[in-house]
Structure formats: structure tokens, C-alpha cells
């Protein structure tokens, strides 16, 4: 298989009634474990990173960190028999989301839920426009589940 758009993985899963884990990595050990599990199960894999992971991997430079993860995931995916995608999880900063898109992420999430709904929609629409122009999928957090997220520790 190869490095694919996250939407492709999710559409196939929906059509065939199965779930796909999207797992955050913070180090190479997590990455290797997730890839090995995917290989063993012959299942697609969605690798996720946070804004903090980009900063860490890039030694303070989030674009360099995003490029590092794209290069890592793509180099592995080329030799695998399973589809693999790379997703930015809960991107809260517009500029960081754009860096992930430019670096070559399969998909990004914009989490502008801290803003009023109209501003959230405005920022989300801008990210969708940028991402879709280069074939990147977008997940958006347009609100929150009141009561459920309040006391999660």
C-alpha cells in the first residue's frame, strides 16, 4: 500500500463497517508499535501527532517537526501492505495547521472550539479552503459536548 489520504481510509471503513484507530505518537517506540500492530492485523493505520509533538520533533520549529513526521511515515508506508495516513490532532493554531498541510500531512484537525461559533466557522472554512486545494482532509471541532468534557481528568 502506501501513504494515503485519511478520508480514503475512513470511507473504506465506513463502507465495510469497521473501525480504524487513530493513535497519537510521541516517540519512535509508539510509532513502531502502531505500525507493527497494523501489519499484524492487516489493518489501516492513522498516525496522529499533536502541535507539541511537532515542536518537539523540530527542536522548536513546528514546520521542521511536521516535515520530520511526514518523511518518517511516508518512508515506512512505501514498503507496507497496509494504508497509512498522518493526521494533525487538535490543531489550535492556524499557522501550525497550515505548516502541517504544507509539510504533507494526509489530514488535519482544526480545533477552534475556544472561539465563538461564528469565528470558529470562519477559521475552519479558511483551513478547509487551504487543505482541500492540495488534497488534504479536514476534521473540525465546531463545538464541545457540554457536561461530558467538563470534568474529564
Regions flagged by a language model, labelled:
Residues 1-21, 74:
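N-terminal amphipathic alpha-helix/helix-capping segment at the start of soluble metabolic enzymes
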Residues 3, 66-67, 90-97, 113-139:
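Active-site-adjacent beta->alpha loops and helix N-cap segments on the catalytic face
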Residues 15-19, 41-45, 80-84, 105-106, ...:
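Short, well-ordered coil/turn segments that N-cap beta-strands
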Residues 17-28, 58-59, 81-92, 149-153:
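Active-site mouth loops of central-metabolism enzymes
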Residues 18, 53-64, 106-123, 150-153:
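Glycine-rich tight-turn/loop motif centered on a GG-T
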Residues 20-24, 45-49, 84-89, 108-110, ...:
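Hydrophobic faces of well-ordered beta-strands that scaffold small-molecule active sites
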Residues 26-28, 50-54, 89-93, 113-115, ...:
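Active-site beta-loop-alpha junctions enriched in small/polar residues
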Residues 40-100:
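Active-site cofactor/substrate anionic-group-binding motifs, chiefly glycine-
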Amino acid at each position: 500500500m502506501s501513504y494515503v489520504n485519511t478520508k480514503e481510509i475512513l470511507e473504506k471503513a465506513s463502507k465495510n463497517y469497521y473501525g480504524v484507530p487513530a493513535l497519537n505518537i510521541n516517540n519512535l517506540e509508539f510509532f513502531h508499535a502502531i505500525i507493527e500492530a497494523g501489519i499484524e492485523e492487516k489493518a489501516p493505520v492513522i498516525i496522529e501527532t499533536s502541535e507539541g509533538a511537532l515542536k518537539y520533533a523540530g527542536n522548536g520549529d513546528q514546520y521542521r517537526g511536521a516535515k520530520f513526521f511526514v518523511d518518517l511515515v511516508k518512508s515506512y508506508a512505501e514498503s507496507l501492505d497496509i494504508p497509512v495516513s498522518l493526521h494533525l490532532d487538535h490543531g489550535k493554531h492556524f499557522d501550525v495547521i497550515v505548516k502541517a498541510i504544507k509539510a504533507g500531512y494526509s489530514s488535519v484537525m482544526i480545533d477552534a472550539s475556544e472561539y465563538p461559533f461564528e469565528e470558529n466557522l470562519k477559521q475552519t472554512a479558511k483551513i478547509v479552503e487551504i487543505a482541500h486545494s492540495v488534497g488534504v482532509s479536514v476534521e473540525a471541532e465546531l463545538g464541545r459536548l457540554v457536561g461530558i468534557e467538563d470534568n474529564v481528568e
